A protein has these predicted regions:
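Basic amphipathic alpha-helical segments that dock to polyanions
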Residues: 66, 70-73
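A short, conserved structural fragment
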Residues: 74-84
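Long, low-complexity, charged/polar intrinsically disordered regions in eukaryotic proteins
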Residues: 1-14, 20
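Short, basic amphipathic alpha-helical segments that act as recognition/interaction helices
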Residues: 50, 70, 114-117
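Alpha-helical linker/hinge and terminal dimerization helices associated
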Residues: 38, 76, 102-120
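Basic, amphipathic "hinge/linker" alpha-helix immediately C-terminal to the N-terminal HTH DNA-binding motif
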Residues: 85-106
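Catalytic cores of DNA base-excision repair glycosylases
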Residues: 64, 81-83, 89
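N-terminal helix-turn-helix DNA-binding core of bacterial DNA-binding proteins
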Residues: 19-65, 92, 123
Length: 125
């Protein structure tokens, strides 16, 4: 931990102060809630996927943005990456235990949102 990390004692354990700009947990939150990070986590909740499967599932994401999002989530320990030594290489991604813990409430949140929205095409007046 660097000198800028802020810990606040809570009970017997120390917790990160996510309101401090140097807090490493803040970076993880930024990656999870980024435009594409949240969709990657939600997509991987259903099981391991290859890069092209993720790209097809997440409509509108470019290869560049998918690569950047995956790199950040792998670096945060939320997603694992496995490369098969084939030609071309097959790269598979899945959620770590940490990633599943973070992804479950996101799925619940999306479920709550979609249950409360009016059906598509319904009069919004």
């Amino acid at each position: 931990m660097t000198g800028g990390d802020q810990l606040i004692p809570v009970g017997t354990a120390a917790r990160y102060d996510v309101f401090h700009t140097a807090c490493p947990a803040r970076d993880v939150v930024d990656h999870v809630t980024s435009r594409w990070g949240i969709w990657v986590l939600i997509s991987l909740q259903s099981g391991d996927l290859r890069f092209y499967q993720l790209r097809e599932r997440i409509e509108g994401i470019s290869e560049k943005m998918l690569s950047q999002s995956l790199r950040a989530l792998v670096g945060d320990g939320l997603v694992w990456r496995r490369v098969e030594p084939t030609t071309p290489p097959q790269v598979t991604y899945g959620l770590t235990e940490f990633g599943r813990d973070v992804g479950e409430p996101l799925e619940d949140l999306f479920g709550r949102i979609t249950r409360r929205l009016a059906p598509r095409g319904a009069d919004q007046s």
